[in-house]
Amino acid sequence: MTEVLFYHLQHQPLESVLPTLLQKTLERGWRAVVQVTTEERMSALDDHLWTFTDESFLPHGTDREAHAADQPILITLSGDNANGASIRFLLEGADLPSDIASYERLAILFDGNDIQALAFARDQWRAVKEGGHDATYWQQDERGRWQRKA
């Protein structure tokens, strides 16, 4: 059964949190697909993952490039799983995939300081639970550490 994780961002921006989660994904030997909602976010995230630290980068590509299926991390606007990912990250209100059960994990990241994002995440939580999936809810504390809330 797919494990669905909700990440309530409060004290760190997405640009700080997502690379860490993606690094852990690659350490497990998994492929990831990251679904965004705008071309601008796709381009910004593509640039950021190459340069987020001076010491390393995350190997990735977008579904607009050749060889999307070969990418360990694929950034997309679509609901497709072109790289055969084990985990799907949904950012900034990306819709739940119709094929949730085809993933080991589904991670939903949202800005807890944005009222609309919070309301959308609550709707997604209800839909996940009504679909019979296990879900956990993680919220950042003041130091940016994750605390399980549900």
Give the role of each language-model region.
Residues 28, 45-49, 53-54, 131-134:
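Terminal and domain-boundary regions
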Residues 81-86, 90-102:
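SF2 helicase motor core recognition
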Residues 10, 33-39, 74-76, 89-93, 107, 111-112:
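Structural motif
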Residues 1-47:
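Long, hydrophobic N-terminal alpha-helical segment
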Residues 47-86:
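Helix-adjacent hinge/juxtasegments
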Residues 21-24, 48-52, 106, 123-127:
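Short, solvent-exposed amphipathic alpha-helical segments in soluble enzyme
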Residues 104-150:
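Glycine-rich, aromatic-bearing surface loops/beta-hairpins
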